[in-house]
Amino acid sequence: MTDDGYRARYRTAQQIRSGGALGNIFDGPRITAHGLSTLVLAWPGTGFQTEAVHTTIVAAGQTSEEYTYDLAEEAFLCRHGQVEVLLRGDWVTLRPGDLAYFPAGVPHAIRNTSDGDAYLVNQICPPQFDLYIDAGLYNPTWGDMDEEAIRKAKLNAEPLDVGPLDELDEMVFRDDQPKVRAQNLTPEEVAHGGALFNVLEGAGFTGIGLPMRLVLWPAAGTRLVGFNYAYCGTGVEDTMHTHPVSDEFLVMWSGQGQLFIGDIGWVDAGPGDVALAPCGVMHGHRSTADRGPSMMGGFASPPQMDLVIPTDYYKNGVYERPQPSELTDSQEHASDQG
C-alpha cells in the first residue's frame, strides 16, 4: 500500500519538482479546455515546467472547439474509445494505441461520433497557462500560479470513475490510414502538418534495458513533444535514470509492477499509475514474480536527448531516422527473466 502522502494530490509543486510523486491518469483537478472536460495531471501546479499532461474526456456525440497553439506542440494518445481528430486537413480516426501529433501553428479539433465515451491523454509543450485561467488556477494579471487554489483543487479532485482499469480497451498496433501515418511521411512533412503515430511503431531502442520504441522524437519530425513505449518483462528491472533537462510523465499503461520515484523509492503500481519525474528526479520500473509484466510509456519534453546520444541515431546535433518497426509480442517476451 502506497502512503497517500506520496500521491501528487498531496504534494506541493516544490516537493514534486525535487522528489517526484505518484499519480494516475484518471486523478486530477477538472477543468474545461476547448469545450471538453479535462483532468490536469502534470502541469505547473505539480512542478512541471517543460510539458503539461492532461486527460481529455470526449463524450459520445461531443465535438471540441477548433483551436491552434502558435507556441506549443500537442500530442493526443487514445487510451480508450474512439474519436476523430482534424489532422492534415481531414478527419482521422484515433483508436486505442494511436497518437495524433500537432505541430505549433496547426489547427486541430476532436469529435466523437461513436456510441461511447473516449479518454485521451494529451501532452502540451510548453504548457498553455491560459487553459487554467477560468478555473482560477492561474492569475493572468500577476502572471503566476495560484498555489492556494491549486492545493484545494488537487485535494478535492474526484477521480474519474471509468470502471476496472484492466478492462479498458487494449492499446494495440495499427497501421491503417496510411496516408497520414508517420512512417509513410518524411520528418519534414510531419514537422509541417502533423501525423498519426502508434505506440508500438517507432525506432528500436534497448538503452535502459527494456525492449522499446522511440515514437515521438526529433528523428520522426517532432520537436518538443516526446513519447517512448516499452515492455517490462517478468523479473526485469530497467536502468535507474534521470533526465538532465526533460520532465517525464511515466505511465504504467497496462499490467502490474513497481515504480521507483525520486525520494519516495519503490511503490506498487497498476494500470494508469504514473511516476511524475521532473528533470533530475531519479525514476525507473520493474516487474517482480508477483507483479508483472507491464507496458510502460512516458511523455517527456524535450525528447530525451540523453537516451540517444550513445546510439547511432544522433551525432553532433543531428538525428538519424532509422526505419520504424513494430514492437512485437515475440520481441517483448524474449526479455522475460522468469
Predicted regions and their residues:
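Short, charged/polar surface micro-motifs in flexible loops or helix N-caps
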Residues: 46-49, 59-62, 82, 222-223, ...
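Conserved hydrophobic/aromatic beta-strand scaffold that supports enzyme active sites
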Residues: 38-40, 53-57, 75, 91, ...
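Residue-level recognition of conserved beta-strand positions in structured domain cores
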Residues: 55, 68, 80, 87-89, ...
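Conserved short histidine dyad/triad with adjacent acidic residue
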Residues: 35-42, 54-70, 209-214, 228-243, ...
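A short beta-strand-loop-beta hairpin characteristic of the jelly-roll/cupin
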Residues: 62-96, 106, 237, 243-271, ...
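Non-catalytic C-terminal interaction regions
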Residues: 4, 268, 274-279, 285, ...
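A short, N-terminal "cap"/entry segment at the start of jelly-roll beta-barrel domains
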Residues: 1-50, 135-224, 239, 311-338
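Ligand-binding loop in jelly-roll beta-barrel domains
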Residues: 49, 84, 96-98, 104-131, ...
